[in-house]
Amino acid sequence: MLVLARKVGESIFIGNDVEVKILKIDGGEVKIGISAPKSVRILRKELYEEIMAENKKAIEFDIKDISEVSKFENR
C-alpha cells in the first residue's frame, strides 16, 4: 500500500486519467473529489463489499433446487 500525505487542494493521479483531490479536512473526516472517465467504476468500500456479497449469494445454489427445475423440463 502506498501512503501519501496531502493538504487541502492537493491531489494525486492514478494512471493517466484518475485524479483524487483533497477538498476538505474537518476533524476526523476527509472530503475527497474524484475525477475519472465514466468507464471507471468508483464505489465506497462498504458498497463494494455489499455488492460482492450479493453476487456470491446469487451464484450459490442447492442441488435440490436443480432437481426441482428439472421436473419442469420433463413436461
Swiss-Prot record:
<dbReference type="GO" id="GO:1902208">
    <property type="term" value="P:regulation of bacterial-type flagellum assembly"/>
</dbReference>
<comment type="similarity">
    <text>Belongs to the CsrA/RsmA family.</text>
</comment>
<dbReference type="GO" id="GO:0048027">
    <property type="term" value="F:mRNA 5'-UTR binding"/>
</dbReference>
<dbReference type="GO" id="GO:0006402">
    <property type="term" value="P:mRNA catabolic process"/>
</dbReference>
<dbReference type="GO" id="GO:0045947">
    <property type="term" value="P:negative regulation of translational initiation"/>
</dbReference>
<dbReference type="InterPro" id="IPR036107">
    <property type="entry name" value="CsrA_sf"/>
</dbReference>
<protein>
    <recommendedName>
        <fullName>Translational regulator CsrA</fullName>
    </recommendedName>
</protein>
<dbReference type="InterPro" id="IPR003751">
    <property type="entry name" value="CsrA"/>
</dbReference>
<dbReference type="GO" id="GO:0005829">
    <property type="term" value="C:cytosol"/>
</dbReference>
<keyword id="KW-1005">Bacterial flagellum biogenesis</keyword>
<keyword id="KW-0810">Translation regulation</keyword>
<dbReference type="GO" id="GO:0044781">
    <property type="term" value="P:bacterial-type flagellum organization"/>
</dbReference>
<dbReference type="GO" id="GO:0006109">
    <property type="term" value="P:regulation of carbohydrate metabolic process"/>
</dbReference>
<comment type="subunit">
    <text>Homodimer; the beta-strands of each monomer intercalate to form a hydrophobic core, while the alpha-helices form wings that extend away from the core.</text>
</comment>
<keyword id="KW-0694">RNA-binding</keyword>
<keyword id="KW-0678">Repressor</keyword>
<comment type="function">
    <text>A translational regulator that binds mRNA to regulate translation initiation and/or mRNA stability. Usually binds in the 5'-UTR at or near the Shine-Dalgarno sequence preventing ribosome-binding, thus repressing translation. Its main target seems to be the major flagellin gene, while its function is anatagonized by FliW.</text>
</comment>
<dbReference type="Pfam" id="PF02599">
    <property type="entry name" value="CsrA"/>
</dbReference>
<keyword id="KW-0963">Cytoplasm</keyword>
